[in-house]
Amino acid sequence: MLNFERKRIMGIYEILKSAHSGWRYLVIILLLVAFINALMGYLGKKPFTEGNRKLNVFALISSHIQLLLGLVLYFMNDWYKGDTAIAIQRYWKMEHIAMMVIAVVLITVGNARSKKGIDAAAKHRSIFLFFGLALIVITAAIINMVNIDPSRHLFGM
């Protein structure tokens, strides 16, 4: 019975890992599109439309789903028990999760501040600033992962 439970849990783990792996592309694309859209809106002095708001909310929601998937995987895989003296275990135990939480916080703050902006320029500026910072943090985490774990590359597992 115990072996069956372990296999079932590992099956769920693999499904969640695949979802987390695939969902990252949606998050990156939505963040990039929202960032570029906000930058063009700010520089072009364009109005902040309902479409802008929806794009930002979709980027926010997708990043929160990605974080939740990651947290479930983190605790299912026992990475939190890893030895921090070993670079790859330290990366997965501490660095990856910390950088992703920081990125999601930046996205959340940027979206919240854009709602409170008094004019279109302030709303666009909040999005391109905070989403841009989140993209920098995510990019740094990816580069760090590739450097620490040679079995991984920029666009794949």
Short names for language-model regions:
Residues 2-157:
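Membrane-embedded alpha-helical bundles that constitute the cytochrome b-like, heme-associated redox core
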